């Protein structure tokens, strides 16, 4: 039987997505020891450095009674040019699950195609589904179901934005995206999402009456050479107190971190009462524990 993978949110049904959110909330509240993954091993392949992804997966496996192995390009033949499919075949004969944080989304797709065990997308250039599990858990904890609500995405139409496009369809919320011309999410993703997703360039229109406001860095890892150009393009796309004032009175603010205060978000908003970024960061642990349990014990 082929394993279940988590390459994008589209690998889940709406019901499964909601069940994972509920399970993550339950696991967060659980105090007594619980080790459903005893003697299981998670292989973690990192092409890009990370704080939250590595720590949350390692701690999650330890709390579940399992263990994890960290593999950087220096530690594997992948870094020396071994075909991706060969690495997938070999690793999946030795570990129980593989998580990859890579540059190219195609790398994760190939791993999933050739792996004998579940493959998890820990982040690629196109999608970041693990972060959306945590984001949605955080919203449900603070405000209840997100169905019928309005989410405003401000800034780059990047991997996070594109994962929000998937989430909007699965959880039935309205997504309004405001980004500079030339930085929109992939057109085919937006078209496939239908009426629940709108793309424009005016931040005020996007945020007006929103229940959740989300942003991300202007230049992601690997885009450092574009920093000056992007700073100019995004200068009018900062989430600050004046912009948040246009949102719903009890709107929340999220950012997947790390944040650059004074660029994509003001320090006042990041540290303010509407910000739930620290809960959001913590929930990477709980949401991914729910995901690991789902993939490895079903």
From Swiss-Prot:
Top-level class of the enzyme under EC nomenclature: transferase
Disulfide bonds: none
Record Pfam families: OTCace (PF00185), OTCace_N (PF02729)
Name of the protein in its database record: Ornithine carbamoyltransferase
Annotated catalysed reactions: carbamoyl phosphate + L-ornithine = L-citrulline + phosphate + H(+)
Pathway: Amino-acid biosynthesis; L-arginine biosynthesis; L-arginine from L-ornithine and carbamoyl phosphate: step 1/3
Location within or outside the cell: Cytoplasm
